[in-house]
């Protein structure tokens, strides 16, 4: 059975509590979308999909854990909105399969409260927005789709006050992943014309060009067998721009119109980054490790090494600003821990480039407003850095409307490690047959 718990601030003549979260959303709706509202109230929603949990258990848990008795009230039915004045309801929750950290924390709390839960019990979190103002359904859909919910990871439902008074409700449908498919390996015939190969790349969203598709075709022709769908996907992923950095590795024909000269650059990365660093490394013995590990390592005194890693998370942050930036910063935290024989993260850094957060123009389809990206990215790096115990010691933010299509989200982590560990150079590591592997995270 699914139980619903809704939590909101106390309302009524005896309460002068301000909904700071609601006021923040009201301001963002005005700033980002140009839509004025009289008020916004935000309720927390929890759906408990638990087998052996009773209504009494849920009431006790909500009383003791979910709601603050001084400032909040809760209901275990979908009636809490009756406490507030509103014209529209928008309820937002995660799509099936999307990580719901608040829901996981609520389940952990329930397990602690009750002593145990079933292995397949789940809790799903969401938010119910109560909007008051002169809005039509088109306005509400715009607010929901462009600001309150991110369609990549979230779902939303809309009710008018009229529908609410008539008894219509959102309901307790939980976003469990339901799959009844059997694993199947598909054979792919690559004996195709060049145009058919490109059609295959487009239809399977491989994002590979003609030369790459022909190389795959020729490879399996030499093997004298068909490729499987899994093999094709693995090759496409490995050859993606994200993994392979094909632009950095490509031959670039460069024309200098000032000096009237032309040259072919064989890999921007190898010519201007790796080669330059290698030349410095040959002259500077304090450069201990570059291009060989999860991070670069230098020696800063007789006893200490400093490791540094930075990377971009641009496209993920454009799709899901908070999640994209969060995984960017914790990813480089991980790389520092994993470089050499382990380094301790001591600092984070970042550089952000966005379009103006006050952008008023028409956005292309599927693009988030730059103000929304700005706020989400900032929160993601903050949560993954400062709030995990690693201080963000410096950074910069640059605004230019040419970043409207894709922001630059540059995240970095620095760490310290001793020069030697048990008599061995800490920046060197090797894996041998029979070694144990530890996975963490």
What are these regions (language model features)?
Residues 1-441:
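Core nucleic-acid recognition elements
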């Amino acid at each position: 059975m699914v139980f619903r718990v809704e939590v909101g601030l106390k309302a009524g003549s005896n309460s002068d509590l301000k909904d700071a979260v609601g006021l923040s959303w009201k301001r963002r709706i005005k700033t980002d979308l140009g839509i004025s509202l009289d008020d916004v109230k935000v309720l927390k929603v929890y759906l408990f999909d638990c087998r052996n949990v009773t209504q009494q258990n849920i009431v006790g848990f909500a009383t003791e854990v979910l709601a603050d008795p001084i400032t909040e009230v809760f209901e275990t039915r979908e009636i809490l909105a009756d406490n507030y004045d509103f014209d529209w309801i928008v309820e937002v929750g995660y799509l099936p399969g999307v990580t719901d950290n608040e829901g996981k924390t609520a389940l952990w709390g329930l397990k602690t409260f009750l002593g145990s839960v079933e292995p397949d019990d789940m809790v799903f979190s969401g938010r119910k927005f109560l909007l008051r103002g002169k809005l039509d359904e088109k306005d509400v859909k715009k607010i929901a789709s462009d600001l309150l919910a991110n369609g990549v990871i979230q779902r939303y439902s809309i009710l008018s006050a009229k529908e609410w008074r008539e008894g219509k409700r959102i309901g307790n449908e939980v976003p469990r992943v339901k799959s009844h498919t059997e694993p199947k390996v598909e054979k792919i015939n690559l004996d195709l014309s060049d145009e058919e190969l490109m059609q295959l790349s487009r239809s399977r969203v491989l994002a590979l060009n003609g030369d790459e598709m022909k190389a795959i075709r020729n490879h399996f022709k030499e093997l004298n067998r068909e490729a499987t769908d899994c093999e094709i996907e693995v090759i496409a992923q490995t050859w993606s721009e994200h993994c392979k950095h094909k632009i950095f590795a490509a031959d670039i024909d460069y024309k200098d119109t000032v000096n009237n000269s032309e040259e072919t650059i064989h890999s921007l990365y190898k010519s201007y980054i790796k080669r330059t660093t290698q030349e410095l490394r040959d002259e500077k013995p304090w450069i201990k490790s570059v291009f060989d590990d999860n991070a670069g390592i230098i020696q800063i005194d007789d006893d200490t090494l400093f490791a540094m890693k930075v990377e971009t998370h641009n496209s993920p942050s454009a799709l899901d600003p908070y999640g994209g930036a969060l995984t960017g910063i914790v990813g480089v935290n991980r790389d520092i821990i994993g470089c050499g024989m382990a380094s301790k993260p001591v600092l984070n850094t970042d550089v952000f480039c966005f379009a103006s957060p006050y952008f008023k123009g028409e956005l292309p389809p599927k693009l988030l407003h730059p103000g929304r990206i700005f706020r989400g990215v900032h929160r993601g790096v903050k949560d993954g850095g400062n709030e995990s115990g690693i201080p963000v010691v410096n950074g910069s933010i640059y605004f230019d409307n040419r970043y409207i299509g894709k922001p630059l989200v540059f995240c970095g982590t620095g760490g310290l490690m001793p020069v030697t560990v048990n008599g061995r150079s800490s920046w060197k590591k090797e894996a041998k047959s029979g070694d144990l592997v530890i996975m963490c995270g």
